[in-house]
A protein has these predicted regions:
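C-terminal motif of bacterial Sec signal peptides marking the signal peptidase cleavage site
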Residues: 5-9
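Exported/periplasmic ABC-transporter solute-binding proteins
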Residues: 10-172
């Protein structure tokens, strides 16, 4: 229902076919927005639907600059973005998982311990019941909605010490 309401405003109200809807933003939305776009085009013959997977921050910026119709973000809008007139509609909820190499016996980490790992207070897995090995952190790049969500949940905004910062959730 939310998706139908979101796209309803993009269709022509005079029954004529044609036009386009462009979306830009969150890479974690790729599968969902692809399916919604296909359905939208099937129900609106002659209308094209495009998706540019640039990341949440870029999608928000694209809407502000008028380069797309719908910005996709896996984070909430910031106060300054709302002040510029942007409105948000929740389309879905995204999950974030912490993954440890299966050869490392670590399990059941609490949120406080995860935060300590990510800000560098804990640097060896043996300190949390794992192997005697360096903690290597891989995550999303700055501007990513997934990263923003993770750092908001863990209280580690702008403090994480990533070894690698990747440009898509799939790459992580």
């Amino acid at each position: 229902i939310t998706a139908a309401a979101m796209f309803a405003g993009c269709a022509s109200d005079n029954g004529s076919a044609g036009g386009s809807v462009s979306t830009d933003g969150s890479t974690s939305m790729e599968k969902v927005i692809g399916a919604l776009g296909e359905s939208f085009m099937a129900n609106n013959q002659g209308t094209t639907f495009t998706y540019n997977p640039t990341g949440s921050g870029s999608g928000i910026k694209a809407v502000l600059e008028g380069r797309c119709d719908i910005g996709l973000s896996s984070r909430s809008l910031k106060d300054d973005e709302k002040a510029e007139g942007l409105k948000e509609t929740v389309l879905a909820y995204d999950g974030i998982a912490i993954i440890v190499n299966p050869e490392n016996p670590v399990n059941n980490l609490d949120l406080e311990t995860i935060a300590k790992l990510y800000i560098g207070e804990i640097t060896n897995w043996k300190d949390v019941g794992g192997n005697d090995a360096e903690v290597v952190l891989i995550g999303r790049e700055g501007g990513s909605g997934t990263r923003d969500g993770f750092e908001s949940i863990t209280g580690t905004a702008d403090k994480c010490r990533y070894r690698q910062e990747l440009t898509s959730t799939g790459d992580v």
